[in-house]
Amino acid sequence: MNVCIYGVGRYGISTYYKLGRRGINIICFGDRNVQKQGYIVKDIRCIPFEKVLELDKNKTVIVVAIKQNNAQLVDMFREKGFRYVCSYNDIKDRADEKILLIKRCQI
C-alpha cells in the first residue's frame, strides 16, 4: 500500500517521520499551495492537488495532514473515490492502531 500525505507543512512533516519510522511506503506529498509544489522531503516530492487525484484510488492511502478543514478534506477525498483516507489527528491520537490499519489497507 502506498501513502500520500496531503499537506507538506508542519503536520505533514510530522506525519512523514511518524509513518516512515514504522516502515510505511510514502510515495508523495500533495498540496494545493503552488509555492509548496515541487518541495522535496527526503527524496519525497510534493505534487499538485490535481496529480493527487490521479493516484490509484484503490491502492493509495491519503493521510490529510493539515491543521484546518481536515475533516472536510477527508470527506472530499472519499467523495473523489479514494477508499483509504484518514487525518493527521487519527495518526496522532492512535498512531499504532492506524498504522496497522494502513499496512492492512483497512482504513
Regions found by a protein language model. Give the residues of each.
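A general structural motif
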Residues: 1-2, 26, 57-59
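Structural/interface elements that position substrates and couple domains in central-metabolism enzymes
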Residues: 6, 13, 24-25, 72-79
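Generic secondary-structure boundary signal with a strong preference for alpha-helix termini
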Residues: 19-21, 55
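NAD(P)-binding Rossmann-fold cofactor-contacting core
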Residues: 22-40
